Amino acid sequence: MQFAEFAARAAEIEAEPADLAVVSLLSDLFSDAGDDLPTVARFVQGRVFPAWDSTTLDIGPRLCHEAIARAAGPNVSADDVEDRLADRGEIGAVAASYDFGGQRGLAAFGSGEQDGLTVAEVDSELRALAAASGSGSEETKLKTLYGLFNRTDPDEARFLARLVLSEMRIGVGEGTVRDAVAEAFLVAPADAAAIRDDDADAETEAAARERRNEAIAAVARALQVSNDYGMVAGLARDEGEAGLDGVRLEVGRPVQAMLAQAGTAADALGEWGTAAVETKFDGARVQVHRDADGEVSLFSRNMEDVTDALPEVVEFVAGAVDDPVILDGEVVAMDDGGEPLPFQEILRRFRRKHDVDRMREEVRVELRAFDCLHAAGDDLLADPLAARHDRLTALLGDDSPAVSDLLLSDDPDEIAAYEADALDAGHEGIMLKNPDAPYSPGDRGKNWLKRKPDVETLDLVVTGAEWGEGRRAEFLGTFLLSARVEAESGDDAFETIGKVATGITDEELAELTDLLEPEIEREAGKEVDIRPSVVFEVGYEEIQTSPTYSSGYALRFPRFVTVREDKTAETADSLDRVERLADSQ
């Protein structure tokens, strides 16, 4: 497939506001992609590598701007590109605004055709670029990018620039790709037509939707296990549902972590009768893989390879386990007395690439495994939680401190006592899990509940925001929050404490944009400064010290609750209150 065709189809998808129509357009693109299908399935999400692969292009905005400037001609600098970015708001629009070398040459001679880029070429060049390292690698990357941009027309440049910076954002999420793969290769054309036909009778449409949902479920199962949209798209086309059903876990290829909702013991017991209760550690999620050759790999919650940062965990697993396994758990920081240290301490170790040996002496970490997804050739995702935990215990031993305790209880008082013990030991709280539930990668359903002590919310002033992308480009989306600093003069100042984008529906985004847009004082690209006037009530899991924000604090996992229409900026929470809450944690 020519990259120009990919760009044209991506532009068509970006311009389409209707979700079903987007799926249809994407389905057509997949059907026409030929041998490039796996690559196209990744490109539409702004990916060059599969979701499970933590390899990155390692290209910062400045390097991309330099490449665009070089392709645009000798009179254009990276600073010029950044000036246009401030005016136009996103890198794709900036790249599309220049006439690059190849296009200038064609215009000058008025004849002939430049060899167009193909999707395969772009993929190959970007993969080679990602592999560049060591002395001179930055210049190598710059030359590669220059060579690509120099062969693009404006539409191609728009989507190449976005792809390079992983900012494709054409309104295509993982669910959209899943549905489009199903529609392209598994759903009968007659069923797809019946679903879209307003005149189809109800029975025909219902039957078509049921078959479509079954096809989508088959794609979803394969994606849960593989985390590779390109591979799954190819299997769906070439082997159908039978091929998808054959996808299995692969040691060394991480899957998305199963996630939890907030909940209570009453919720758990009311739903399941008996709950599996575990300690909720104040650590970092980690997925442990040991292959048949004894090699151990560790992956973060975001599937980033963190093996080199945690050598003591690697050593423990290598010595404790003989068979290929995939485990889920957390790594926790411990003091010399075996007491847990705060989350900030584990961050000093997690993802560290340098001075690992020195930091190992300063911050000791240990594994706390709570699930087993694969053991000795057996995929265990479909097994009940209780059975998976039994397999985990058999692997690591009944008395191993690396195995998280599991209490099966239908007694609220017993669960409350377990929670009190966990809190007294310095942990975050407890997890409540359905003992009969399978492991569902990437799912934040009702089978796992996190129960932590209630924390207060904060009423914070909105002092900035960012415009969204794609179909959300007309809405403000990420909001900068500030705490009030009381001044003797009576003219309060505001110090930043974090950003919130979680817990806000599309309808609320529209309402918040209408509320805040009149208060915009300055715009620079996507970022806007907002006059302190609107107060958000914000929930959070913890207040942390942080140099990132001017207050010296940051909210861990902030979430939007509501607009405090009864409050003004002058009556919002003060930085003094933030400090008191932080001290009381």
Curated annotation (Swiss-Prot):
Give the E.C. number(s). 6.5.1.1
Q: Cross-referenced PANTHER family, in alphabetical order?
A: DNA LIGASE, DNA LIGASE 1/3 FAMILY MEMBER
> Which named protein is this?
DNA ligase
Q: Which HAMAP family match?
A: DNA_ligase (MF_00407)
Cofactors needed by this protein, per the record, are: Mg(2+)
By its UniProt entry, which InterPro entries does this protein fall under?
ATP-dep_DNA_ligase, DNA_ligae_ATP-dep_bac/arc, DNA_ligase_ATP-dep, DNA_ligase_ATP-dep_C, DNA_ligase_ATP-dep_cent, DNA_ligase_ATP-dep_CS, DNA_ligase_ATP-dep_N, DNA_ligase_N_sf
Q: What is the lineage of its organism?
A: Archaea, Methanobacteriati, Methanobacteriota, Stenosarchaea group, Halobacteria
- The entry's active site is K280 (n6-amp-lysine intermediate)
Q: Which family does it belong to?
A: Belongs to the ATP-dependent DNA ligase family.
By its UniProt entry, which CDD domains does this protein fall under?
Answer: Adenylation_DNA_ligase_Arch_LigB, OBF_DNA_ligase_Arch_LigB
Q: Which reaction does it catalyse?
A: ATP + (deoxyribonucleotide)n-3'-hydroxyl + 5'-phospho-(deoxyribonucleotide)m = (deoxyribonucleotide)n+m + AMP + diphosphate
Q: Which residues bind ATP per the record?
A: E278, R285, R301, E330, F370, R444, K450
SS bond list:
none
Q: What organism does the UniProt record list as the source? A: Haloferax volcanii (strain ATCC 29605 / DSM 3757 / JCM 8879 / NBRC 14742 / NCIMB 2012 / VKM B-1768 / DS2)
Give GO terms: molecular function aspect only: ATP binding; DNA binding; DNA ligase (ATP) activity; metal ion binding
Swiss-Prot/TrEMBL keywords = ATP-binding, Cell cycle, Cell division, DNA damage, DNA recombination, DNA repair, DNA replication, Ligase, Magnesium, Metal-binding, Nucleotide-binding
Origin: domain of life: Archaea
One GO BP annotation is:
DNA recombination
